[in-house]
């Protein structure tokens, strides 16, 4: 039973399908970020139909005034959502997205767990991780779809790091390349999760290096120290390779990352840390002067407390278990030349889980305020993503009896359901609600945008929804003819009886270039709202506005291309070296 990979994949996919069955009866859960993602997916699909493969400007945000949403928000989630919208009715896209992403998360956990656990235990870990309470909370209360997708990368992160630690699992430089690819995927999926993943990678690498140093000291004491391609890697080498993977990963993601970093000065990025979404406002059981915030915080805090309790149980009862002996022939079992090495996986999982739990508590506030960029994770309970990797792996090690495992799962699920009913029931959008959203995109009405993507010093709350696309100045009204009004290009003609300024229904973002009668023209902007103001002369004026390719985007594309070529070259070289006879005198790169 369940002895072949296909049957296990069917079980995992089926379990994830069961988890979203409420979608079939009640519609789509309309969590905190539901409209943000749905409108993004719909607009991306619309821009694809205009021939824009990689959108940068969300033209329909702020009711048609636009924002640079797709320049700053990582592309993987909105690409997947738009692709699903291209082949499925919009009313079923959220459910399909959640099912695919939960299944991917479970598959990545199975890939990790199978290295140390028998197939039945690995399948349990995969299903538990895919459907852990925090993932379900994201699906039904938060609709943080990009964050949910990032959860699929966390087991792969640990797997890549352990491959650096266990040279026989995959020789050569390929583990470093796999790690760089995972880190690049993190940047392209969700920025707060990418910060969390990089901090996790750094911390886990330091622990691995310490374990390697302890193994080396133990080998010295026993007279067994022998550094070779088949021995434990030197701690410094592990640190260097992780650093190289981080650099290469950032290089691969530079086509998104460099413009997002460089053009932050053109928006008010401080809005992402406004009151209510700051770390200090979102520690477990924290209350502020916002009843809605407090109810949701109580819900997520209750779920987190239950999961922390389960983690402590799993850590305590798995402390004497040898990970490698659970699955004969796995890398740990083959390479466990010392007790420290045999328990490396357990130590990493324990440290990762405990540190994740601590970072959700207010006692860690000084870390959030002083560690570079950590505060841009916004909400500390995002560390539940990492904590659940540890819990999913440690629980089958601690509880060998299926009754204990199922009881633990039942208690956690009951906690989520009861806390949800008591503190904050989920909201639901029916097919008619999603149809209204789709109509707002189709007819050009647009939607409410996000404050953090509005050009700096501009006030989106003062916008006039009834403003025409182009408005003339004082005096005689000019004759205006719209020729093109697309997401990345606007073109119109104006016949004016006197020189005047035109106001365009468009934020004056620096990437917009304006050409009047074939000549580049410097623009101004309106007070308060910051709309584009174009000076024109009397007579006929042909005006062309286009979203230009800035130098930072060009450099980002070049860096990504160079990084990709480097990755392919090094991968091919490592692949050739893997088939060469080992040199007993060498030490590997």
Q: What label would you give each PLM region?
A:
Residues 1-223, 227-322, 333-428, 541-546, ...:
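Membrane-embedded transmembrane-helix bundle of lipid-linked glycan/lipid transferases
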Residues 107, 399-400, 408-499, 503-509, ...:
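Extracytoplasmic
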Residues 9, 48-49, 128-130, 353-357, ...:
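A generic short-segment signal for beta-strand/edge and adjacent turn/coil regions
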Residues 325-327:
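Positively charged N-terminal leader segments that act as targeting/secretion signals
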Residues 466-577:
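Active-site-proximal, structured, solvent-exposed surfaces of multi-pass membrane proteins
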Residues 146, 272-277, 288, 444-478, ...:
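Contiguous hydrophobic segments
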Residues 580-589:
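Cytoplasmic C-terminal tails of single-pass
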């Amino acid at each position: 039973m369940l002895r072949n990979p296909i049957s296990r994949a069917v079980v995992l996919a089926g379990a994830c399908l069961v988890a979203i069955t409420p979608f079939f009866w009640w519609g789509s859960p309309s969590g905190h970020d539901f409209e943000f993602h749905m409108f993004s997916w719909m607009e991306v699909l619309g821009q694809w139909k205009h021939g824009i493969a990689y959108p940068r400007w969300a033209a329909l945000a702020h009711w048609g005034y636009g924002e640079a949403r797709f320049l700053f928000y990582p592309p993987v989630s909105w690409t997947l959502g738009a692709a699903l919208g291209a082949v499925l009715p919009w009313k079923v896209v959220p459910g399909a997205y959640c099912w695919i992403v939960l299944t991917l998360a479970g598959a990545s956990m199975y890939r990790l767990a199978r290295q140390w656990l028998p197939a039945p235990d690995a399948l349990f870990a995969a299903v538990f991780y895919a459907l852990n309470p925090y993932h379900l909370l994201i699906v039904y209360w938060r609709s943080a779809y990009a964050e949910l997708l990032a959860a699929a990368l966390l087991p792969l992160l640990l797997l890549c790091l352990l491959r650096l630690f266990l040279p026989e699992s995959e020789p050569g430089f390929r583990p470093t390349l796999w790690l760089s690819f995972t880190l690049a995927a993190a940047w392209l999926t969700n920025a707060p999760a990418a910060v969390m993943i990089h901090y996790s990678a750094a911390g886990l690498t330091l622990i691995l290096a310490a374990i390697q140093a302890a193994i080396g000291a133990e080998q010295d004491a026993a007279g067994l120290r022998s550094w070779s391609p088949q021995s434990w890697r030197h701690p410094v080498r592990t640190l260097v390779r992780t650093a190289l993977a981080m650099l290469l990963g950032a290089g691969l993601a530079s086509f998104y990352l460099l413009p997002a970093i460089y053009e932050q000065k053109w928006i008010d990025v401080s809005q992402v840390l406004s009151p209510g979404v700051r770390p200090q406002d979102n520690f477990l059981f924290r209350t502020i002067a916002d009843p809605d915030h407090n109810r949701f915080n109580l819900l997520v805090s209750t779920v987190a407390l239950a999961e922390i309790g389960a983690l402590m149980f799993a850590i305590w009862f798995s402390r004497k278990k040898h990970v490698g002996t659970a699955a004969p022939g796995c890398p740990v079992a083959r390479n466990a030349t010392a007790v420290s090495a045999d328990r490396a996986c357990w130590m990493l999982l324990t440290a990762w889980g405990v540190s994740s739990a601590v970072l959700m508590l207010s006692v860690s506030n000084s870390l959030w305020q002083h560690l570079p960029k950590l505060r841009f994770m916004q909400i500390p309970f995002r560390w539940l993503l990492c904590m659940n990797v540890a819990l999913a792996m440690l629980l089958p090690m601690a509880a060998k009896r299926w009754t204990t495992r199922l009881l633990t799962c039942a208690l956690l699920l009951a906690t989520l359901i009861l806390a949800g009913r008591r503190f904050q029931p989920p909201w639901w959008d029916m097919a008619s609600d999603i149809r209204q959203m789709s109509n707002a995109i189709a007819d050009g009405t647009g939607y409410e945008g996000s404050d953090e993507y509005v050009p700096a010093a501009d006030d989106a709350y003062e916008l006039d929804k009834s403003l025409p696309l182009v408005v003339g100045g004082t005096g005689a009204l000019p004759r205006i003819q719209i020729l093109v009004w697309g997401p990345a290009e606007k073109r119109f003609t104006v016949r004016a009886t006197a020189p005047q300024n035109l106001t365009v229904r468009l934020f004056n973002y620096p990437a917009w270039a304006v050409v009047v009668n074939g000549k580049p023209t410097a623009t101004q902007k309106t007070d308060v709202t910051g709309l584009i103001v174009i000076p024109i002369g009397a007579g006929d004026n042909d005006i062309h506005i286009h979203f230009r390719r800035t130098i930072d985007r060009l450099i980002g594309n070049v860096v990504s291309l160079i990084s990709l070529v480097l990755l392919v070259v090094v991968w091919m070289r490592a692949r050739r070296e893997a088939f060469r006879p080992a040199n007993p005198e060498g030490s590997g790169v």
